[in-house]
Design a protein with these regions (language model features):
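N-terminal charge/polar-biased segments
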Residues: 19, 26-32, 196-224
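Acidic/His-rich, divalent-metal-binding segments that scaffold phosphate/diphosphate chemistry
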Residues: 25-89
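Active-site hotspot residues in diverse enzymes, especially metal/ion-binding acidic/histidine motifs
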Residues: 58-65, 72, 187, 199-214
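Divalent metal-dependent catalytic cores for phosphoryl transfer on phosphate-bearing substrates
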Residues: 68-180
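Divalent-cation-assisted or electrostatically stabilized phosphate/pyrophosphate-binding catalytic cores
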Residues: 163-205
Length: 224
């Protein structure tokens, strides 16, 4: 890490420590088992559940990759719950989520992270979401949410149906095709890379690596 990255990492760790002292931190709020039960309370569609599991696994991978390994489960919980309101309340996405999460005993830090992944997006009821990603974890969530969907769709087009043998050039070709996985916003993905201070290629490369590395784990989760 550079000196600036180290200072940022220390500041974020200290903020999370203070939050936990206040009783709003993840470890005091909800377990993975309870988070999964809460997710399934509001989500039944296998596609939505698979997306939640995918983002959970990718978030945990990024936590470890970026030096936040001790917080990998925390990052994963955020990924698991990020779309909790989408299935039942699609026109209130990220607006209804705080209510559902608070009822489930989820801490305000996770709620902020979940809501922030919709930053700048105008949802079905005409509201433009204005909760900005602040923590590195929140910026990663914003960046990978749409991208995991695009990579997953690209994998399904391959004979192997896998990300493990997918090369970056193949992904970039699909990415540049506006008609492919059109529902996965390239604008949001590119804003996500910008918020992280990364080139788009870096985000594509790392997210592809994350999905390939966690593919077997994800398959086991879906089969359970």
């Amino acid at each position: 890490m550079t000196h600036t990255c180290v200072l940022t990492w220390l500041a974020e760790k200290y903020t999370m420590y203070l939050n936990m002292r206040k009783g709003v931190g993840f470890m005091e709020a909800i377990s993975r088992e309870d988070a999964l039960a809460l997710l399934k309370k509001y989500n039944k569609d296998p596609f939505h559940l698979q997306h939640a599991f995918t983002v959970e696994a990718v978030m945990k991978w990024f936590a470890k990759e970026m030096g936040y390994g001790d917080d990998a489960d925390y990052w994963g919980i955020v990924g698991l719950l990020h779309d909790i309101d989408f299935e039942l309340y699609p026109t209130e996405h990220c607006v209804k989520a705080p209510e559902l999460l608070r009822e489930g005993g989820v801490g305000e830090d996770i709620i902020h992270a979940v809501v922030s992944h919709g930053y700048g997006i105008t949802i079905g009821n005409g509201t433009t979401l204005d909760t900005k990603p602040e923590h590195t974890m929140e910026k990663v969530l914003f960046a990978v949410d749409e991208l995991t969907g695009l990579i997953g769709a690209a994998a399904l087009m391959r004979p192997s149906k896998s990300t493990k043998d997918m090369e970056l050039k193949s992904l970039k070709k699909k990415y540049k095709s506006k008609g492919f996985a059109a529902g996965c916003s390239r604008e949001v993905i590119e804003r996500g890379a910008e918020q992280l201070g990364w080139e788009l290629d870096k985000l594509l490369t790392l997210t592809l690596q994350a999905m390939a590395a966690t593919e077997d784990e994800l398959r086991r989760e879906i089969e359970n």
